[in-house]
Every structure is written in structure tokens, then in C-alpha cells.
Amino acid sequence: MRNKIIILATAVVALVTFTASKQKSVKIFLAGDSTMADKEEIAYPETGWGQTLPSYFNDNVIIENHARNGRSTRTFISEGRWDFLISRVSKGDFVVIQFGHNDQSKKKADRYTTPEQYKANLEKMVSDVRAKGATPILCTPIERRKFDKNDNFVDQHGNYPNLVRAVAKEKNVILIDMQHSSMDFLIAAGTEGSIKYFLHVKPGECKKHPDGKEDNTHLRPEGALAIGNLFIEELKEVSKQHKELKPLVKNLNNGEIKLTYTIKIKEIETLKSNTNNNLDEGEKQAK
């Protein structure tokens, strides 16, 4: 009897191990701007919130961060970055899309996108992802840090976040409302308490900004971790209404959350430059 129990237990363990090894990996692609993008070491402590995401998932989840500094939906598409991303997407994958900071920058004509074109670009992205049998996830842009003299929070995105919400509603797309969650987070932190989350660096602290900088758009590691956590918490909440998110939620882990690089920037840029010569020129203009 004892031998039979041992044999049965061994068989169960073997079956579980075999099943786990056969489990299909889940891929997440990130498309966005500098607030999401991976950063090279020279830019430290500037950090994109996309850098935190791999730590939230187990090894069954593979993340490719295609977000790049200075990109709007228009330039991300025109430089061939979107086509390159889509060429790597397969059925069952997920594509997280967060743009808006550069689209609404009227003072920067090289990246500005009209509201009408912004909405059309998001619709194109959603359509392209679905055509590959993958799941699009739209994110409203995270908030910049701005408070008035009375310590009231000031939104700077205008109607662009509402256009993301409109596309999500009209096309029945999963929406992660990063604007609302990040706004609530910054208001709770307050005028002074929120400084530590953004790229306020002293002279000599950052190689990229040797004279120092007060930047209320880009994140420090503390800010990236906070925004990454907001994304994951909302993802878990939204998954209650969207069962297609089950592969992501079931692969979340409870380990220590830390910063990481999903795919080295130079490696992914090399891959992309082999498919589109416009990428290098676009990279120079965005620096």
C-alpha cells in the first residue's frame, strides 16, 4: 500500500511539472513615451514606470518595452516603431498603449498631434492589435506634477485623456485610467510630498543633467514604482470585468518589486533599425 501511495504521489508531481513546463508563455508589449520607457544608465535617476512591470509577474510572462522618449502616437507610427512592434505580436499577446504627453505638446511641432489624429491613431493601434489576435489595453497618460499657489492640483493634458476613454468605450477596449489614479496619488502626496517622485536632481547627481534639473514630467525610481503599482492594482480590478486578462492576473507574483530592464534599449534599437531606416533619425530628434 505504501509503495502505491509513493508511486501515485510521484506521478502527480511529474504531471504538475510537465503541465507547468508546457504552459504557454504570456507576452506583453509596451507602446508609449518617456514616462513608460526603459532608460539607459546615463539617464539615472530618470526611470520609466514600464521598467517596474517585469517584477510584478513570474517568469512565464515576457515583456517587451518599445516605449521611447519624445514619442507621440504620430511619430511612433511614422518612424516605423508601431509596425515593428506589431510584427512581433502573436495571437494571445497583450499590447499596453500609453501616449498623450507629446501628442498634446503644441509648442513642439515635431511631435504634436491634433486631437482628431490622436484619436484616429489610437483606433488604428487597437485595430492592428486585434487583427493579430492579441488584446489591446489603453492607458490614459499619467499626470505631470503641477500645483497652483493655493496647492490645488492642475491638470495639463486637456481633452486628450477623454479621447482615450472615448476610444475605449466606442471600441470596447480595456481601459486603465492612469490619469485619474496618478492624479489621486499626487493630490494625496501634496505639493511638497510629490517632489520626490519626479526628476528633481541636484548638480552632479545625474550624468545626463550635470547642472541639475527640476522636471515635473519624468519620474525618479520612487515615482516609477508608485505608477507601476497603480497600473497593476487597476489591472487586477479591471480583470473582474474582463476575463481575457486572466492570463496576466494568474501570473502575478508576490515577490519583491524592483526596477529592471525588459529588453536592453540598444538591442531593441538594433532590431528596429534593421527594418526601418527612419528610426535612427527620429531618435536623434527626440534627444
Predicted stretch roles:
Residues V12-V13, I28, D148, Q156:
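Extended, non-catalytic scaffold segments that flank or surround catalytic motifs
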Residues N3-K4, A9-S25:
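Bacterial Sec-dependent signal peptides at the C-terminal "C-region" and cleavage site
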Residues K22-R68, D83-K91, K287:
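Serine-esterase "nucleophile elbow" of acetyl-processing enzymes
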Residues A37-P45, A67-F76, S105-T113:
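Acidic/histidine-rich helix-loop elements
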Residues T19-V26, I268-K287:
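Sec-dependent signal peptide cleavage junction
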Residues I63-N65, K246-N253:
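Short, conserved aromatic-histidine micro-motifs
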Residues G80-L225, N229-V249, T260-I268, L279-A286:
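Alpha-helical cap/lid subdomain in secreted, periplasmic
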